[in-house]
From Swiss-Prot:
Keyword Ligase attributed: no
Annotated signal peptide: none
Organism: Rhodnius prolixus
Protein name as it appears in the record: Thrombin inhibitor rhodniin
Function: Thrombin-specific inhibitor. Appears to form 1:1 complexes with thrombin. Prevents blood clotting to allow the insect to feed on blood.
Annotated site (Reactive bond): H10, A11
Length: 103
């Protein structure tokens, strides 16, 4: 993506990003944010758990079909699925409107 190189210290202070990735320190997370992941935020100190985003997504199993349109113009089965996507596959996606996206 041709982003700017970042001069981050080699200090190890792991943080978990909203994309489910573990960054070696807050600087490397901010570097990723400014180089192609503008919606990236720190979720918590320490490494991400391997199934961190899967737990939230599993909570959606069995939820009723009530389609919503995300800000990425993708129709999600329900608001829970949209929230799941916002922390995993589509960081930063928000509710655009209820009902399926218009094509």
């Amino acid at each position: 993506e041709g982003g700017e190189p970042c001069a981050c210290p080699h200090a190890l202070h792991r943080v978990c990003g909203s994309d489910g990735e573990t960054y070696s320190n807050p600087c490397t997370l901010n570097c990723a944010k400014f180089n192609g992941k503008p919606e990236l935020v720190k979720v918590h100190d320490g490494p991400c758990e391997p199934d961190e985003d899967e737990d939230v997504c599993q909570e959606c199993d069995g939820d009723e079909y009530k389609p919503v349109c995300g800000s990425d113009d993708i129709t999600y089965d329900n608001n829970c699925r949209l929230e799941c996507a916002s922390i995993s596959s589509s960081p930063g996606v928000e509710l655009k409107h209820e009902g399926p996206c218009r094509t």
